[in-house]
Amino acid sequence: RRQRQMCIRDRFPGTYFHIGGDECPKSSWKNCPACQARIKAEGLKTDKNHTAEERLQSYVIQRMEKMLAKHGKKIIGWDEILEGGLSPEATVMSWRGEAGGIASALQDHDAIMTPGGNGMYLDTFQGDSKIEPVSIGGYTLLEKVYSYNPVPDTLVTLGKDKHIKGVQANHWSEYMYNTDIMEYRMYPRMLAVSEIAWTPLDKKDYKDFERRINNAYVRLDGHDVNYHIPQPEQPNGSCNFVAFVDSTSLTFKTTRPETMVYTLDGTDPTPLSTQYTEPIKVTETTTLKIRTVLPSGKMSPVRNITVEKQALAPAKVVEKTTPGLKMKMADGTFFKASELNKATEWKEMTVKSLRDIRSQVESTESMRGVKQYGAIATGYVDIPEDGVYYFTTNNDEVWIDGKLLISNEGEVKRFSRNDKSVALAKGLHELKVVFLGHIIGGWPSLWDDASISIRKADQEKFTPIKPEQLFY
């Protein structure tokens, strides 16, 4: 043990040592004989403030604090270390909002603010999830980061603000598969974190910061640093395949005021292409290419949008239907729909809803403890009225009237970036759904719910297809 302690001292020469302490599943400690034996041996009791299990965590942390103190170190821990009572010299890192930092300061302990909900998590989206690289979720624009004040007014009023030692932005990397994506999420938001840490509150000015960002971009370019450039986004969710019947107008915006340029002749836009100033009206099938251009001339990725004129696909005439969908399943791990052609053993059944396509059968032989499988569900979906409908799903494939509408093949099955729209007449339309159980990019597709959501072109929000819309 002494050897390990010496190793810690030598490898981490700084004063502070972060011990973690977050997300410990204390509920499982209730059924752990070793944990309960330690609770009994140490005389840890449940009281009105803490459970015995929370006291156990505090006991462990205090032991660690004493061990590290022998080597001249102080501990930092996530705000869960408050739950069993704070160790004497502990500094709290407040990530679940500001409450942990405030509670720590009120006990005259130091704290570092890093609340995810206040913009201090940089692994979140900073644009429309439909066109941005996959992320854990959340939505944090540059202005939200810059606007955060890490010193709560409550502590200023009580004279406890001296205990807020600083601010930190976390950059969790489970959806950052290369350095480009890591930098893309980090910048320019990390520049805003720097300013809120160093700039007096009365000197903060977001409009001025927004102007100075353009100068910072040039400096980042000089160091070959990748950074986020706001892309042209459509209201109600961006989509790269827009169907229409007679004519349509495409409206775009950016999350920060930047110039947008576009073409309708199939060429990629340049800084000198037509500037977007008003909705673009389209009456014939065309390819719209649009991107953002910075004052330096650097441009965002091109958005290639197919705008297709369609007649309403006619509804199917079916004499007799039964609620639900037909489905067949094959055990195994499949990464492409075409791999299902090799399956030899199928189980056939019917399901009442799209969510029923996803099942979890326990298996000790599979990652995540559930059996992997592929499934194909077929039947009809009832469309309530004539119109253009946008579809979104995390399933591998969705077919409408015998045509492939959405394919998410090979992608992380989160926040689908392959939405499409289609013109449909009122009534029944053939539906086929392909669901593959697998893990891509660290995300198990079995964590999804197999739903499909739709919205009419003139509606703002998607709604899941309901069981009463499904027939076979």
Model-derived features: positions:
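Short secondary-structure boundary/capping segments
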Residues: 33-42, 92, 127-130, 344, ...
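Short, compositionally stereotyped local motifs that mark structural "simplifiers"
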Residues: 204, 210-382, 388, 392-394, ...
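Aromatic- and acidic-residue-enriched carbohydrate-binding clefts of CAZyme catalytic domains
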Residues: 1-2, 27-52
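Short, small-residue-biased leader/transition segments that mark boundaries at the very start
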Residues: 3-8
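Short, internal active-site loops enriched in acidic
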Residues: 22-26, 81-83
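Substrate-binding groove of N-acetylhexosamine-processing glycoside hydrolases
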Residues: 12-16, 40-260, 377
